[in-house]
Amino acid sequence: MERIKELRNLMSQSRTREILTKTTVDHMAIIKKYTSGRQEKNPSLRMKWMMAMKYPITADKKITEMIPERNEQGQTLWSKVNDAGSDRVMISPLAVTWWNRNGPVASTIHYPKIYKTYFEKVERLKHGTFGPVHFRNQVKIRRRVDINPGHADLSAKEAQDVIMEVVFPNEVGARILTSESQLTITKEKKEELQNCKISPLMVAYMLERELVRKTRFLPVAGGTSSVYIEVLHLTQGTCWEQMYTPGGEVRNDDVDQSLIIAARNIVRRAAVSADPLASLLEMCHSTQIGGTRMVDILRQNPTEEQAVDICKAAMGLRISSSFSFGGFTFKRTSGSSVKREEEVLTGNLQTLKLNVHEGYEEFTMVGKRATAILRKATRRLIQLIVSGRDEQSIVEAIVVAMVFSQEDCMVKAVRGDLNFVNRANQRLNPMHQLLRHFQKDAKVLFLNWGIEPIDNVMGMIGILPDMTPSTEMSMRGVRVSKMGVDEYSNAERVVVSIDRFLRVRDQRGNVLLSPEEVSETQGTEKLTITYSSSMMWEINGPESVLINTYQWIIRNWETVKIQWSQNPTMLYNKMEFEPFQSLVPKAIRGQYSGFVRTLFQQMRDVLGTFDTTQIIKLLPFAAAPPKQSRMQFSSLTVNVRGSGMRILVRGNSPIFNYNKTTKRLTVLGKDAGTLTEDPDEGTAGVESAVLRGFLILGKEDRRYGPALSINELSNLAKGEKANVLIGQGDVVLVMKRKRDSSILTDSQTATKRIRMAIN
């Protein structure tokens, strides 16, 4: 107080005021404080003080040639006095105004390309539709979401290499562009940005937005794809939500959505094959999504979904350490347990072998439409706090938690036998048996569970067995909360192992995922999914199987032809004929197969009876295990278009139609490809032309090894002999000529000699 009085006293004297306002500051410490370092100590003051001066800006001298000395109002735009300490000119803020109005206009052609993500966002918002605002409690849960629509899925390192290559191509530093996407993007961007005048740093920032997925952990109630997240601040508050339909889609959301659909289809299909893991890998490697290889997408895309994670595990990639049960993602937040096998009796006195988890554990459960916190001990649910969008979602969460708890009253609530099977007709494991049972009907489970009186806790309410809310009573241990449970934020990935049946385990042997956890939801993919694997032919129905099978034979005709004559059994066992079997009526499959195999054997035995069209047409029928019978068929039935259709053994039919003139095969009216050789022109065509330079020595001679296809002949050395398979399924012995002179006459003699060798 004394000090303040003293200061007031001093300030009342005019001399004090004069000293403080007029004298220069010459205390070294003060000068040091305001002048050391590059950092401005009082930016706003500095700005105000600078702008109060007449010429606060400095610029390169050449600006004086581009800006007049005075503007239209006669105000001076730049000073003739040089800036102290540099050879730059001092410029008035008015010069900036003049430049903005009258300065040169640069080309704007690159702006939409560089600021692509912004231009696209404006378009989406322009075409988006905002609906009504609803006031209601928002159950938001924090989820990891993509906040950057329209990006490619490169890793930070990959993107950095692309950016350096595009923006600073001459900088030193090793950059290795390896992935397909890196190379495509680099080429595209280099072309787009020729003669671009925008600052390289800005270009680099904008490219980063385009190439890398940026995620944040945000509270969301509703759509989580990036086109919804970009308007999160407009669509949901604490107590309101605004309906919104985006005005456009972005590729990254489409990739995520299509990847999930492809992965689900592949896991479902692999689960029913003889070797699920091998099949799954084969399908992942041969599938493309929107023109990009699925395996490349899996390596880069962080989407966490059960089927996607199974595919990643199969490829040896790390996945999240949380596990899945009943469509919920469980993450243990505390406690620990040990597994012990125990036999329990259901209410129907059926014995189940359960892997019981002994110990106290706490979990968060996060599903699509409900979330929960679960505390459990050995075979006992202690507490379940659940929140969901609607009654149905809450029921789903409660059922999953009750089954997961392994409580005795849950096992005893089973009525009837448990015999659920998976797609491959194998019995499900006991936990999934119980889950399926109560997912069908949970009435008995809820009634048997027991109820208890509850305390009044803010934000929580009880729930009765018939799913009505109550403030007095609740099912034992179960409460419904207004607040959602956040998704587990840790993005840590762990090394996992996968067994032949696609069960994914962590390093401690806990099962994290299995095909039973893959959702059965069907959806329509946004991007084209191309499954090249024959295992996926049936996904589009019987017609697709039929067409794909015949297309495959035609595409591989050269090798098929050799196998047909040399090693038919191997050919019949090819997996490409597997899907076709489902089209042939079960009762007669074996007879058809026996009939066709006998027919083929006759063709092999009787020279000159080889008939390409017939072999192609009947080959798929020979793949089933044959039954020996005397039956002859003039037509074979296949089940397509909802009924049996007939393929004629000799001649064309609506199913299989070969046009000799155009050499085109149509299956069910759809083009199935062109045969590269004509089955009915004898041997004079392709063979005699290709056999120029070879001498035909006579019939096949086994000492010279298996028959080669015509394409393989080019590998022979001069004078070398080999057996070769010619168009009619006949094998002849040839020798490559030692001289080239007589090549012209070869084609005539070839034709004669082939006839002689055969006959």
Curated annotation (Swiss-Prot):
One example of a Gene Ontology biological process annotation: 7-methylguanosine mRNA capping
Entry GO terms, CC: host cell mitochondrion; host cell nucleus; virion component
Position of sequence motif Nuclear localization signal: 736-739
Entry superkingdom: Viruses
Entry keyword set: Cap snatching, Eukaryotic host gene expression shutoff by virus, Eukaryotic host transcription shutoff by virus, Host gene expression shutoff by virus, Host mitochondrion, Host nucleus, Host-virus interaction, Inhibition of host innate immune response by virus, Inhibition of host MAVS by virus, Inhibition of host RLR pathway by virus, Inhibition of host RNA polymerase II by virus, mRNA capping, mRNA processing, Viral immunoevasion, Viral transcription, Virion
Disulfide linkage: none
Protein location: Virion; Host nucleus; Host mitochondrion
Nuclease listed as a keyword: no
Pfam families tied to this protein: Flu_PB2_1st, Flu_PB2_2nd, Flu_PB2_3rd, Flu_PB2_4th, Flu_PB2_5th, Flu_PB2_6th, Flu_PB2_7th
Gene Ontology terms, MF aspect: RNA binding; RNA-directed RNA polymerase activity
InterPro entries xref list: Flu_PB2_2nd (IPR049110), Flu_PB2_6th (IPR049114), Flu_PB2_C (IPR049115), Flu_PB2_CAP-bd (IPR048298), Flu_PB2_middle (IPR049111), Flu_PB2_N (IPR049106), INV_PB2 (IPR001591), PB2_helical (IPR049113)
Summary of subunit composition and partner proteins: Influenza RNA polymerase is composed of three subunits: PB1, PB2 and PA. Interacts (via N-terminus) with PB1 (via C-terminus). Interacts with nucleoprotein NP (via N-terminus). Interacts (via N-terminus) with host MAVS (via N-terminus); this interaction inhibits host innate immune response.
Job of this protein: Plays an essential role in transcription initiation and cap-stealing mechanism, in which cellular capped pre-mRNAs are used to generate primers for viral transcription. Recognizes and binds the 7-methylguanosine-containing cap of the target pre-RNA which is subsequently cleaved after 10-13 nucleotides by the viral protein PA. Plays a role in the initiation of the viral genome replication and modulates the activity of the ribonucleoprotein (RNP) complex.
HAMAP family recorded: INV_PB2
Name under which the protein is recorded: Polymerase basic protein 2
Organism: Influenza A virus (strain A/China:Nanchang/11/1996 H1N1)
